Structures are given as C-alpha cells and as structure tokens.
Amino acid sequence: MASADVHMAGGAETETFAFQAEINQLLSLIINTFYSNKEIFLRELISNASDALDKIRFESLTDKSNVNAQPELFIRLVPDKASKTLSIIDSGVGMTKSDLVNNLGTIARSGTKEFMEALAAGATDVSMIGQFGVGFYSAYLVADRVMVTTKHNDDEQYVWESQAGGSFTVTHDTTGEQLGRGTKITLFLKDDQLEYLEERRLKDLVKKHSEFISYPIYLWTEKTTEKEISDDEEEEDNKKEEEGDVEEVDDEDKDTKDKSKKKKKVKEVSHEWVQINKQKPIWLRKPEEITRDEYASFYKSLTNDWEDHLAVKHFSVEGQLEFKAILFVPRRAPFDLFDTRKKLNNIKLYVRRVFIMDNCEELIPEWLGFVKGVVDSDDLPLNISRETLQQNKILKVIRKNLVKKCIEMFFEIAENKDDYAKFYDAFSKNIKLGIHEDSQNRAKLADLLRYHSTKSGDETTSLKDYVTRMKEGQKDIYYITGESRKAVENSPFLERLKKKGYEVLFMVDAIDEYAVGQLKEYDGKKLVSATKEGLKLDDEDDEEAKKRREERKKRFEELCKVIKDILGDRVEKVVVSDRIVDSPCCLVTGEYGWTANMERIMKAQALRDSSMSAYMSSKKTMEINPDNGIMEELRKRAEADRNDKSVKDLVLLLFETALLTSGFSLDDPNTFAARIHRMLKLGLNIDEDAAADEDADMPALDEGAAEESKMEEVD
C-alpha cells in the first residue's frame, strides 16, 4: 500500500494518498480537454457495478453466506437535484481498504499509458476508456468531485474521495449510511452537467448503453400528482395517501355527495424505484426477432465499444449438448490484441443464465481472441472451477462449435468486399495465426487469405482466384516473402517467373512466414518460395533447354570455383542460376532453412536462440546469371588471372549487393560503403595513393585493372 498522510476528522481516521503519476496525467487530460460524448461515464460506472455483482454472485455459488449482508443483487441510480449529486449504488462484492487505495489511484492499470497515447494521437476516442481498464476515471468528465463509499465482506466500510487535484483521501466510515455490502459512487456534478439529474436523460442513457446488463437497474423517480379533495377530507386524505384513490372508485354515491362540498387541488410528491432494463437476456430470444439495433446495443453494453459491431453470429446447439451463444466481430482490433500478459476476457460464460467467468481460456483459442460474445450452457455445473474446466469434455465440444461458427461468420463477412477489407485489415494476423496453430481448420482458413501479387495491381487476390489464373502446365503456387510490397515487387527472384508469365504472391506480413510454413499446399498444389533453392520450372523437361543449361554451367564452372574460394564459408556453394534474367546474381536459402525475411524476423527477436539462428540461417547459395555482362567480364578476368585483385573486390561487392537485393542485412555496412567509394574513385580516375590507407582485407585495385576497367564497363 502507498504511503499516506493521516489525520483525524470528526473522530474518524482519514488518510491522504497521492495519485500515481500516470493516473494524475490521465485525470488532467480528462478534466482539461473538451469531449462531446461525456455521457459514456454512466455506461462505464454501470459496467463496473455489473462486474462487481458478477463477482459476488460467483462467490455465492460456493458459499451462500457471502450474500447474507444484502441478498438482493441490484444497481440503483439516485439523482438528487437539491445537492446536485448523482449516485450509482450496487450490491456487488465491494472493495476492501487495500482495493480502494490500489485500484483507485496508486497502481496504474496496464492500459493507462496506452490510452493517453492513443487519445493524444487521435487514434481512439474517450468513449473507449473502458477497454483500457480505466473506466472509473470517466466520472470526472461530468463531476468535479467524486466520493466512493464501499463495504466488502472482509473489511469495514470506507469512503474514498477526490477532487482530482493530485491526491485522494480514504476514511473509515462509521457515521454514514451502512451499505451492508457493495459500493456507492456519488458524483458531485459540474454546473454545466446537471442534465444527468433528469429522469428522462438517465433512462435514455441506460436504454442506449446498458439495456442488456444482467442485473436490474433501478432509477429513484419522483412522481407529482394533482388531485382534488374537499376541505374537511384534506386532513384525513393526507393520512391515507395510498388508499384515497381506491375509496373514490369503490363508492360512486359518496363521490356524488362530495361534489356539493368545496373542492381544492393539491400536489402530491411521491418517490419510487422504477426498473429501466426489463429486457430478458438477448441470447434467449430467437435471432429472427432481434433487430440489428438491438444487437448493436447489446454488443456495446457487453464490450464498452463505441462503434457498432462488424458481424454477429447468434445460434443455439441442441441435442445431447445444449448451449446458446452470440458472437461478435468488432470493427477494429483492440490496442493490446497480441499482448501475451493480458488474459482473454472476450467471451462471457454463463451457466443457466448465471454468469460464471469472462476469462475462460479453454472456451476459445488464442487466435480467435478478438471475437466477443456470450455463451450460456445448460449442461455445465454451476460450481465449475478453473481446474475442472480444463478436463471438462462439454467445454471442449462447445469450443469446437464456437470455432466452427466463427469461421462461418468470417466467410459471411467475405461476401461483402468492403466489410471484408475492414475485417482483413484488422484481423488478418489472427487468421494466419489460426493457420499456424489449428491443423483441423487450416484448409478452410486458407480460403480467407488475401495477398497482393504480380498480377493483382492494387487489389488483393485469394488463393482460390490465383489457382483459376494459373497458366497451363503450371504445377505450383509461387510466393515471395519480404519486409514490404515495395521491397519484393522488383526482387531479382521474380525475373524468370515474370518472364514466363507466372503469378507470384507477395507475403509481406511477418506472420506469413509461420503460416506458409504450416500450410505447405493449397488445392493439391504446393506453395513454393521464389527465394529458396530447388526452384523448378516446367521448361526444365525440354531437352534443348537442358543442353543449353549444361553448356553454360560448364563455361562458368571455373568462375563459380573462384567466387566460392573468395567468399569462403559466407556461402555454401556457387551455382549457375535458372531463376534470374537481368540481375548479375542473387542469394537463395536452403529449401528447409530460413528465408532472408525469416532471418530478419528472428534477428529482431530479443530472446532468440543464437545457436538455432546460426544453424538455420547459414545455408546460402549464390546463383550467378551467365547472361549478364558483368558476370561474363568477371569470367574472362578470372580465367586470365584468378589472383587478379579486382576480381576479389568485384566478387565481394557483388556478394554484398546480392545480400541487399535478396532481402538479407549486411553484417558490416561500413566495409560495403568503403568498397563502393573505392569503385567510384576508380571510375573517376582518382589516384589511390592520395587516399587514406586501405583496409587489409580489401586490396586496392591495381593500376592495370584500373586502366582496363572503367566504371561504365562494369555497368
């Protein structure tokens, strides 16, 4: 617990605490920035109240005495125009003193910083505050002072209070109204926010944002009635406020006589609790009876999202196993979608309408972590625990059905091109993670993939469409992986494939490497990387082509040996290429090793296994283009004098250039730059002796070579 200043006030001990720095910044942002949608504060506070009620109801399943202090589970709203306060009361689990200090001020939630950064960058809206775990502080959108009175079964009643001036107080409450159990949040509204004391406004807000909360939400309403009474009955009627109307209806004769007496009108003010949310759980109703607006309202109350959902799947499974479920796909991915420290809490699990938990990892796989919704089972035991969940066969069947229905929903989204573009932009990584992890559904998920290609232009293509465009005689699906579309679309690896008119898919998402490693084939056709060795094209069966290839190999055999000797263990072998048309050379990786892109990804892993990296990334093959002028000139020089210093320099320069064009990174960019500078000096006829001492492993190009080979010849 944080350190505090302690003083006595009215016999009760009051402690003052400082807000944690990030929370102080957040409060300052909320208070000093103008937001048009301040109304979301009520949704956030009701949502928190609902969570507290969920907790006590779950605790009561194992020990009924937990609800003895307040058996009824409710949320109450009390507007008080006289004091300009709005109170939100719940009979939930309540908070201990330690909870109050930690949860409301001294320990920042993981999302505090992210929320402020997203707000400042304009990437999110203040109404998303609940998704970042700091919804309580939205109270300061409408209030300049907030008081939280709370009672937990394991502690005394305490009052938390703050005007958001950098600190808050916590007082042991012995004199105030005793709650029994639960929390009462009192908002002292700003003068320009008094609309939130109006019954109509509060009813509208609950219907808009919190209609489908599982607990009754009551509003303390004021009713003014005007009635006529005779003078001599005024006193008697005042005593019988509740019975008066009944007596008048029952006795018509008496009413006729009363007309002769003098009447007078009086106003009667009465108060009563009115339940605002009377809808039964939406998942119990038939899908055809529910409007899109009702689904949207339920989705927003379930998730605290401010946008409508992108898609919904409402279904029930009947037979040996029975459960009902509603699943939603949001319009955008949450900021912490792949945060491994965060527990999945997007699917709420109910058993016979009783909320059990919302972070049941066994209910849905990690790759579907973005799907939100509810599952209500009649077959699971009410007292199910996390330990028994893992072995529960019913849950495994539910999980299998949820995955199946999610995939169906994704295909339904794919029927609308614009909607699917939004979906794919937000959640394509999840689909690819599913391909990597879910072997049973891998083939189905492959149909959801979309890629740019050498023939798709600005559009993307599916694997299915790619297959329909395959050239006659083409046996495989070709792809290239890389850092970006720009980095791969002019890659030397594509030269021969483009010349033959074969389409190549651009896989430029880091996770594509993992997905394609598992997918391996589609529709009976192998997925073949354009950057790995062993690329076979259909004309290799042509006898004449084979003969030409053998002749070229023989002619460049000596140069291949020279290059291998110069490069040593930097490459595994040097061969004549069949895949490049214009470029002088390229570097390919082994069929089962990492691609250049995968090597880049693995180097970026902070906790990578260095020994594995060395093993997987060392197998490079240099392929040289026998039709390229540079290679032909290099062959002549090597044959004339294999110890020619210019040959070594040119080979090293070609190797380092090939590293870059093939998607690898340079281990020593300074040496590469120095080599380029020396080639420039050579081309410009700058005397080498005037330059600084050269690096030992980069011998200067001799004068004979300099005269023989100007830069334009090398080009």
Curated annotation (Swiss-Prot):
Its main location: cytoplasm. SMART domains: HATPase_c. ATP binds at N48, D90, F136, R386. PROSITE patterns: HSP90. Residues 243-253 have a biased composition (Acidic residues). A motif (TPR repeat-binding) lies at residues 711-715. GO terms for molecular function: ATP binding; ATP hydrolysis activity; ATP-dependent protein folding chaperone; unfolded protein binding. It is found in: Cytoplasm. One of its GO terms (biological process) is protein folding. Gene3D superfamilies: 3.30.230.80, 3.40.50.11260, Heat shock protein 90, C-terminal domain, Histidine kinase-like ATPase, C-terminal domain. Keywords: ATP-binding, Chaperone, Cytoplasm, Nucleotide-binding, Stress response. Residues 226-262, 693-715 are annotated as: Disordered. GO terms for cellular component: cytosol; perinuclear region of cytoplasm; plasma membrane; protein-containing complex. Homodimer. NCBIfam families: PRK05218.1. Belongs to the heat shock protein 90 family. Molecular chaperone that promotes the maturation, structural maintenance and proper regulation of specific target proteins involved for instance in cell cycle control and signal transduction. Undergoes a functional cycle that is linked to its ATPase activity. This cycle probably induces conformational changes in the client proteins, thereby causing their activation. Interacts dynamically with various co-chaperones that modulate its substrate recognition, ATPase cycle and chaperone function. This is Heat shock protein 82. It comes from Zea mays.
